[in-house]
């Protein structure tokens, strides 16, 4: 008995089913690839290829000599939260350092505090109240604040004091450093940050602390102009991405001893 040929309606229905199955498999494959890529990207965060290859994971902050005053350490977390609400500070993360509302209790040298006062800075801003203790403690952080909120001081002051401490322990020589790198999106911002650090470093030296040398790495600035800094070792490098890459390729600057990284803006 001859078999009846499927109708056009049935053929269309079968075709739609096959296309639906094909699309489902394709979507599943795309989703699987997306998850693999996301997992790989997450794993690469703040880690180099050598660290990933050796499965090195960092679970502890860099040890620093700075400690908050005893009365700050003895505050309860509830008291810390009350202070954060008072100054409109929002914090996320595990066991954040306590907020400190003045530079003196942060143990900032008097000479630096006096220098800040000459610049019209009498007290820390909200991001500095939380961000400075965080950086002083050796913790990683992402700081968000409005323009003019004091972000530059939040990342530059801890690096300056860490550098002075390192120089006082073992004086830097030619080829040493930097121990801190600040990457800025523009030459103008990099120069402003560099000038701010340089002024604070001079006030710190006048106060009897070790000399801290900063290097400005931007287009238009010849390295021959800063050769004296390179000869004595560099504590802090302030750079734009393009110039930094060029100096790394030419081995003018090495990052083997860099333990402090800031990506500005």
Task: List each language-model region with its residue ranges.
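Intrinsically disordered, low-complexity accessory regions that flank the conserved helicase/ATPase core
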Residues: 1-105
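Conserved nucleic-acid-binding Ia/Ib motif block in the N-terminal RecA-like helicase ATPase lobe
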Residues: 111, 171-249, 257-260
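Short coil/turn segments at secondary-structure boundaries
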Residues: 118, 129, 156-157, 194-196, ...
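Conserved P-loop NTPase nucleotide-binding/switch module
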Residues: 263
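Short amphipathic alpha-helices and their capping/turn residues within compact interaction modules
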Residues: 108, 113, 117, 121-122, ...
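The conserved Walker
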Residues: 145-149
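Conserved pre-motif I regulatory segment
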Residues: 93-144, 154, 161
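Walker A/P-loop NTP-binding motif
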Residues: 129-141, 152-173, 196-201, 245
């Amino acid at each position: 008995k001859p078999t009846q040929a499927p109708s056009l309606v049935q053929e269309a229905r079968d075709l739609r089913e096959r296309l639906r199955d094909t699309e489902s498999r394709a979507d599943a494959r795309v989703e699987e690839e997306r998850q693999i890529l996301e997992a790989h990207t997450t794993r690469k965060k703040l880690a180099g290829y050598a660290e990933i290859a050796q499965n090195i994971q960092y679970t502890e902050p860099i040890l620093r000599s700075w400690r908050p005053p005893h009365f700050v350490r003895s505050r309860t977390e509830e008291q810390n939260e009350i202070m954060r609400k008072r100054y409109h500070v929002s914090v996320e993360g595990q066991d954040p350092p306590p907020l400190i509302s003045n530079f003196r209790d942060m143990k900032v040298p008097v000479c630096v505090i006096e220098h800040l006062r000459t610049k019209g800075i009498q007290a820390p801003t909200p991001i500095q109240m939380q961000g400075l203790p965080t950086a002083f403690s050796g913790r990683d952080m992402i700081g968000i604040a409005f323009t003019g909120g004091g972000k530059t001081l939040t990342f530059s002051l801890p690096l300056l004091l860490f550098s002075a401490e390192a120089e006082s322990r073992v004086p830097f020589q030619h080829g040493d450093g930097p121990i801190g790198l600040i990457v800025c999106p523009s030459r103008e911002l990099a120069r402003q940050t560099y000038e701010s650090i340089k002024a604070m470093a001079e006030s710190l030296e006048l106060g009897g602390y070790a000399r801290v040398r900063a290097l400005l790495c931007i287009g238009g600035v010849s390295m021959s102009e800063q050769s004296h800094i390179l000869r004595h070792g560099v504590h802090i490098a302030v750079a734009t991405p393009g110039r930094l890459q060029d100096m790394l390729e030419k081995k003018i600057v090495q990052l083997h001893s860099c333990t402090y990284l800031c990506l500005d803006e």
